[in-house]
From Swiss-Prot:
Its main location: cytoplasm. It is an enzyme of class 2 (transferase). Belongs to the methylthiotransferase family. MiaB subfamily. It is found in: Cytoplasm. Residues 404-466 form the TRAM domain. Residues 22-142 form the MTTase N-terminal domain. GO terms for cellular component: cytosol. Its EC number is 2.8.4.3. This is tRNA-2-methylthio-N(6)-dimethylallyladenosine synthase. Gene3D superfamilies: Methylthiotransferase, N-terminal domain, tm_1862 like domain. NCBIfam families: miaB-methiolase (TIGR01574), MiaB/RimO family radical SAM methylthiotransferase (TIGR00089).
Length: 469
């Protein structure tokens, strides 16, 4: 579930006392859930009159929403905070105030240490308490240095405002919606259970209400998010037990919601109902991100994945049997402690058998506090890097082959945003690819029939199907 740093902005709103709005700059690192969290923090800040800026220099509040998955994540944050300290000092000399906040998983993991190492920081707030951000800022303005990383007893989503339709519309025709947080799997390489906590599922009514609000605001495609999204569970209208598949069936009933996706999944939680949803729901896109991490049973056991390579392959076979056009994505780690050449070759064999449309791969990075950090037989960095290079070459080859296999196909394309060229829009294919096509800006949000004509580095090209020769 990875994404490069992104900027998200709070919606516009004037202060309750009628004075000029304050400016907020939010920088988001990491996964899609952090992107979603930044959006919800923006909505919460809007109630206190914070409006967006893309210029950090003019911000009254700079908020870093951080990620802790990779090695040196914290050091990158401290480096950014060093630059912000100088900016804050310069503004103070000019008689201007700037507050600095750190949110997200580094905030959760580091807590008070952030205030010790970065004295310019005013607020540190965790991913389970960001609904209390406005109050934390008020306390900071009174001179307190605030750390709020305790797991909240109350449901944060009940305390967060939902944006108005006009603000949702300004954000685009696709949206994220968090339905589940935390993880109970305790893979030995992963910090998520320690930074996001145990698995928690949002109630059906809350999810449906938010989805309906998004659709009212012009959203055509919703991606359901969770650290382990297919572990979501809840109660149906008669109190019956629901799993993610049931939730997808319910959301597919919302008028105007054309497309559904979900990420990130664990193989152990792909149940029959969810597989049936892939078979039955036209709105559920034929794309599945299903991380496996390794093709070696020995390494999978050391990772505490609790499934074998054969079980993963069998699951893929079952899914493809009901949805032959589904495209697979995955995550892989090279150089996990104890990984031998044979273990790595097992991973390559699994990749060859699955044939991914795209995948994400990383060198193993030691995360303090995880069981993996205590394992012996740590793999040398040069071997990790060499294996990663080989794996990525294979995955890139498969991605290119999948893209080329799309040439000549007619597909339904959701038009999302302007392209780089005049008269061009960028749309999203059912398989999550960016597709360039000539279309009018007024068509953003439409789903049109196109024919794929070619491939680019990270995108496809298409023409309107009715205009195709």
């Amino acid at each position: 579930m990875t994404q490069d740093s992104a900027l998200l902005k709070a919606p516009e709103q004037t202060l309750r006392d009628g004075s000029n709005s304050r400016k907020v700059f939010i920088k988001t690192y990491g996964c899609q859930m952090n992107v979603y969290d930044s959006t919800r923090m923006s909505d919460a800040l809007a109630r206190d009159g914070y409006e967006p800026t893309e210029d950090m220099e003019e911000a009254d509040l700079v908020l870093l929403n951080t990620c802790h998955i990779r090695e040196k994540a914290a050091e990158k944050v401290y480096s950014a905070l060093g630059r912000l300290r100088e900016m804050k000092k310069k503004k103070a000399a000019d008689g201007r105030e700037m507050m600095i906040g750190v949110a997200g998983c580094v905030a959760q993991a580091e807590g008070e240490e952030i205030l010790r190492r970065a004295p310019a920081v005013d607020v540190v707030i965790g991913p389970q308490t960001y609904h209390r951000l406005p109050e934390a800022l008020r306390r900071a303005k009174e001179g307190q240095r605030v750390v709020d990383t305790e797991y909240a007893i109350e449901d944060k989503f009940e305390h967060l405002p939902v944006a108005e339709s006009r603000k949702i519309r300004a954000r685009g025709v696709t949206a994220f919606l968090t339905v589940q947080e935390g993880c109970d799997k305790f893979c030995t390489f992963c910090v998520v259970p320690y930074t996001r906590g145990s698995e928690v599922s949002r109630p059906v009514s809350q999810i449906v209400e938010e989805a309906e609000k998004l659709v009212e605001g012009g959203v055509r495609e919703i991606t359901l998010l969770g650290q382990n999204v297919n572990a979501w569970h809840g109660a149906g209208p008669r109190g019956e037990a629901w799993s993610l598949g049931d939730l997808l069936y319910r959301l597919a009933e919302i008028p105007g919601l054309a497309r559904l996706r979900y990420t990130t999944s664990h193989p152990r939680d792909m149940d029959d109902r969810l597989i049936a949803a892939h078979r039955d729901l036209r709105a559920l896109m034929p794309y599945l991100h299903l991380p496996v991490q390794s093709g070696s049973d020995r390494i999978l056991k050391a990772m505490n994945r609790r499934h074998t390579a054969a079980e993963y392959l069998s699951l893929i076979e079952r899914i493809r049997a009901v949805r032959p056009d589904i495209a697979l994505s995955g995550d892989f780690i090279t150089g996990f402690p104890g990984e031998t050449d044979k273990d790595f070759e097992d991973t390559l064999r699994l990749v060859e058998e699955v044939r991914y449309a795209q995948a994400f791969s990383f060198k193993y990075s030691t995360r303090p506090g995880t069981p993996g950090a205590e394992l012996k037989d740590q793999v040398p960095e040069e071997i990790k890097a060499e294996r990663l290079e080989r794996l990525q070459a294979l995955l890139l080859k498969q991605q290119q082959e999948f893209a080329e296999s799309c040439i000549g196909k007619e597909i339904d394309l959701l038009l999302e945003k302007p392209g780089r060229m005049p008269g061009q829009l960028i749309g999203r294919s059912p398989w999550l690819q960016s597709v360039n096509v000539d279309a009018k800006a007024s068509q953003i949000g439409d789903i049109i029939k196109v024919r794929i004509t070619g491939t680019g580095t990270n995108s496809l090209f298409a023409e309107r199907a009715e205009a195709a020769v």
